[in-house]
Amino acid sequence: MFLSKIELFSTPDSHKWQKRMTIELKRTNSENEDFYNLVIDLEKYLTHADEKAHSECKPYNKLETIKHVIVAFIDQKPIGCGAIRQFDKNTVEIKRMFVAENARGKGIGTKILTELELWAKELDFKVSILETGKMMPEAINLYKGNNYKQIPNYGQYKGMEKSICFEKEL
């Protein structure tokens, strides 16, 4: 079951064509095969971006602890994902945010993040937190652009120099 459909226009050049694409968002869980395959792509991307920093964080990204997942599709092909997991009674942690390279720059990350925040509110969470790498400027811009504020590194990320953490009241 798809949660929502969002139509976007893609304009690679203002003097050329416009293409309508439909993004579908699906609520699921960490057992979803499309999510699993996107996480494999995410792992490859993170390892390439900074192998040492990624290896430090890897133990904290186990899929078994994730129950709420959004998978984004264009033309029925999975192109992005994100997840939430409970951090404490009032706080949800954003995990496994990823958009395939060929689908970036279209606002898909924002759509996934917005849907995750909505789902977290439906589950009565009040605050959203997350960690990303300092070597991920696109991710940092995504979170800042969606009103996340930088906070001191929390939990397992304390002392990790290459991590940066954010928070947002929902």
Provide a role label for each language-model segment.
Residues L113, A120-T132:
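Conserved GNAT acetyl-CoA-binding A-motif
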Residues C81, T110, T132:
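Ser/Thr-centric signal marking residues that sit
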